[in-house]
């Protein structure tokens, strides 16, 4: 009986403690007709500078408003296990401990608006698995880190408005799993609609927020903006421009293209999947299975120029587990695009007949090969195989031969001396059999499409006679490897107008070894291939153009050429070319001898006329300036006998002399004598 009484007292005490309310707060209990209820606590004392610690443990909603609290300490609410709504608004909170919200497993709503937060502990959202509303409005947050994105998937309402954000992570809008299809049978707890508040921030409008800009231009039922009328603050040309009217430069969503969407291949064969993507900035390409799981195959990825990227994934010795869909995903700051390639494995196992150096017919299993894309694989320049080309400074090609159970490949890259360029892949989708030719010509076409042309005895076969299956057989036979043989000291021993003879030293070779000679006009697109016997250690290349420059590489049969196995040479010029230059020089010299004196004579005449023109105009002006008079005084004709018309010239001379001079120096010998004038 005594123990029972003590137990009642303890329970009463604990119940009283659970109902205690801090002096600076008000606690209300709202009951319901069914006997249940919830406790609401409001703390708004302006003198409160610390969080209260003796809150009722059954508190469901806690509001701490308009206080001077500056910090939320670690595990500040850990004992409020029933707390569902936490409002710490319009205080002076500047920092939050990462473990401040520990044990709040029932919390649905967290509002921290109107504080001075410069950062938020995003990882603390893991302590609140049921949180749906996060309000960070009107703080001083400057950025959202990339690490925060994985914690946002369960939020249905996120308000980051009126902060100091200038940008967001490019994948910000991909934080919610509803944007990606959810596999059937998987429980998705993420909300079906997201409400975002992003207005009133000094946004820098570039590719990083291009998805958000595009979102403001369309109506998306899954994502709702609290205020779609957001404006750009930077760069200067977009200052004050609404998102709906902003046009971003150098920002283009990726576009993906595959060479084939369906591939059928025999069991145990090798398959290449190719994917090409364009966009700005240059997109990155990844390969996944249909369930988004990563692939475990060899992938080569290269960007021949800005805004373009290709990728090839190699499936060697495929089996039934390799059948299915493969996704090629291209992604950049502006968005993501994907394409799907379906691989079907046929249950027929065949063994190809290995080719040899003589011409014969061989059978190959049917292979469908498709270039593709994947993760990037870097290749050092020291191990790159080189070949001269004129495609572009940033392009090259590589050819892959497929023969089960392994895939051999080599790269032919354009170079000058020792310059190594980036790699572009020669993609082939071929199967069946063909006859081996002694001389082959590989033609690479622009635009990403590449064909294989075969020449035999110096003449090319018509396109219709060479099927894709034959092309693969020829390409396969060029890749038979003799790993121990090596070519050294390649040199030119003789040159003519239309041919050249090459010689070399060969080490670690067998008696029946063969070598492959690859040559092309320097900078040309046609690549010619011929076989030679290594026992002679020399080969003569005929059919060259006089005065032309060529590049040639000599390597063991099936082994790609290396840098030290290539040489550049020129054929002799035709003598007629020199005579033409001499004739042109003589004609030019003769023309100069004839024309130069004529030009000098014309210049002399022009200068002479220029010098004579000035006195001529002065004489003309003098004639028009002076007036002729018959008499100087208005007397009768009888009185002025001395100034008769017969003396008109003398009157003119008199006008040129001063009056005083005339009167002092004129004398008359007689009445009828001629007067003399002195000036």
Swiss-Prot record:
Segments on the Lumenal face: 20-582
Q: Which organism is it from?
A: Homo sapiens (Human)
**What clinical condition does the entry mention?**
Night blindness, congenital stationary, 1F: An autosomal recessive form of congenital stationary night blindness, a non-progressive retinal disorder characterized by impaired night vision, often associated with nystagmus and myopia.
According to its UniProt entry, the protein's GO biological process terms are:
gene expression; protein localization; regulation of fibroblast growth factor receptor signaling pathway; response to light stimulus; synapse assembly involved in innervation; synaptic signaling; visual perception
Subcellular location per UniProt equals:
Cell projection, Dendrite; Perikaryon; Endoplasmic reticulum membrane
Asked if Transferase is a keyword of the record, the answer is no
In the bilayer, the protein is annotated as: Single-pass type I membrane protein
Where is the major localization of this protein? other
Q: Where are the transmembrane segments?
A: 583-603
**Chain positions covered by the region annotation Disordered:** 351-375
Query: Would you tell me the protein name for this molecule?
Result: Leucine-rich repeat, immunoglobulin-like domain and transmembrane domain-containing protein 3
Can you name a GO cellular component term? perikaryon
Q: How is it modified after translation?
A: Glycosylated.
Q: Where's the Ig-like domain? A: 254-344
- Per the record, the gene is LRIT3
The chain's Cytoplasmic topological domains, given as residue ranges, are: 604-679
- Carbohydrate-modified residues: 296
Tissues with expression: Detected in the outer plexiform layer (OPL) of the retina where it localizes to ON-bipolar cells (at protein level).
Domain LRRCT, residue spans: 201-253
| Function statement | Plays a role in the synapse formation and synaptic transmission between cone photoreceptor cells and retinal bipolar cells. Required for normal transmission of a light-evoked stimulus from the cone photoreceptor cells to the ON-bipolar cells and ON-ganglion cells in the inner retina. Required in retinal ON-bipolar cells for normal localization of the cation channel TRPM1 at dendrite tips. Seems to play a specific role in synaptic contacts made by ON-bipolar cells with cone photoreceptor pedicles. May also have a role in cone synapse formation.
- Per UniProt, residues of the Fibronectin type-III domain are 486-574
Q: Does the keyword Signal apply?
A: yes
Q: Which InterPro entries match?
A: FN3_dom, FN3_sf, Ig-like_dom, Ig-like_dom_sf, Ig-like_fold, Ig_sub, Ig_sub2, Leu-rich_rpt
A Pfam family annotated for this UniProt entry: Ig_3
Q: List the disulfide bonds.
A: 275-328
Question: PANTHER family given for it?
Answer: LEUCINE-RICH REPEAT, IMMUNOGLOBULIN-LIKE DOMAIN AND TRANSMEMBRANE DOMAIN-CONTAINING PROTEIN 3, SYNAPTIC ADHESION-LIKE MOLECULE SALM
